[in-house]
Amino acid sequence: MQLDEVRHGLEAFIADEIGAQARLGSLAESDGHAGLTFLFEIVDGARTLPYVIKLPPRGVRRSGNTDVYRQAPLLRALHADGLPVPDVPWAWEHEDNPWFGLPFIIMERLPGHTFFVWDPAAGVSRDPADCERYWTDCVTTLARLHAFDWQRHLPDWEAPMELEREITRWERIYAQAPEPAWARAAAATERALLDSMPAALPFGLFHGDYQPGNCLYQDGSLVGVIDWELSGIGAQLLDLGWLLMVADAAIWTPGWMPVNPLPLARVRALYAAGRGEDFDHVDWFHALANYRLASIACLNVKLHRTGKRHDPIWEHNGRSVLPMYERALALVAGA
C-alpha cells in the first residue's frame, strides 16, 4: 500500500470515527515486519495525538505474523493488566471496511527510543551504565511479561505452539540457503535439537523476538515493548534463549558485536529472580535461538544477495550463520 493510499484512508477514517473537527497531521512510513507500518498524528483541537497503524500486505494469506489483527486482543489484554505495551484504540478484523479494504490495527505510539544492540541509532547512549540499565530492564520486564495469566485473560486467543513444530517449521526456510554448507549445518542442528528436546516448561505467552531493539526506553528506563508479530502461546524459554543469543559475543563477528551486553550468567540470574524460579534446559533454548536466527538468515541473505529484498544488515548476520549453528550444537551437547 502506497503512502497516498494510507493518507486517504486515514483522512476518511478520522472523519468517520472521530469527527469533522479532527484532521490527519503528519504521516510517515516506518520499518515494519511482515506487514506495513506507518506513523501518524491525529490533530483534534489543541491536542496532537501520535499513533501507529499496521496493515498486512495485499494478497498475502492472513496467518501467524501476517495476521496483524491478532495483535489487537493481545495488546489490549496486556495493557489492561498494567504491562508496558501500546494500547489499541481501534482495530478491524476483516477486509470489509471502507477505509483500507484490509484488516488493520491502530496503536498508541509510545515515547522513547529503541536500543538496536549491534548498531544503536545516533543519539542513543553507549555509556556502559546506560547500556546496563537497558539490558537489565529488558530482562526484568521479560519476567513480568511471562507472568501474564493468558489462561484467564486470553484463553481462546491462540492455539498453543508445539515445541517440535517450532523446530521443524524452519526446514523450508533454511533449505533456501545461498551456501550449501549452511543448509547442511542447519539440518545437523535440527536433528540434534529434536533428539534432545526437553519438556516445554514454563508454558505461556512468548514474544518471539524479545531483545532491547524491540523495547522502548525513555530517560534511561524501559517504557514499552513493541513488535509482537511473532508472539504466541508455548514454551516461554524461547524468549530467554533468544535474549541470551543476542547477548552472546561468541557468535558475532568484529564490527557487528552487541553493545555492552550483560554477562550471560547475569541474564539468567535476573530472569530467574523475576520469575522466582531457576529453570532447567536454558542452554537448550539458547541453542534453539541460534538455530532459529541462523535459519532465518539463510533466507534473508539469499533475498538480499539476489536483489529481491535489499537489506545489508543480513550480510552482517550472514557472517554469523555457521558460528550460530556451531554454537547451537555445542550448547546441546553440554545441556
Per-segment meaning from a language model:
Residues 203-205, 223:
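Conserved protein kinase catalytic-loop anchor
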Residues 277, 281, 295-335:
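Helical subdomain adjoining the active site within ATP-dependent kinase catalytic cores
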Residues 1-22:
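Juxta-kinase regulatory segment immediately upstream of eukaryotic protein kinase catalytic domains
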Residues 226-231:
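Activation of the activation-loop gatekeeper triad in protein kinase-fold domains
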Residues 238-275, 289-307:
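Active-site activation/catalytic loop segments of kinase-like enzymes and analogous catalytic loops
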Residues 205-207, 212:
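Catalytic-loop of the protein kinase fold
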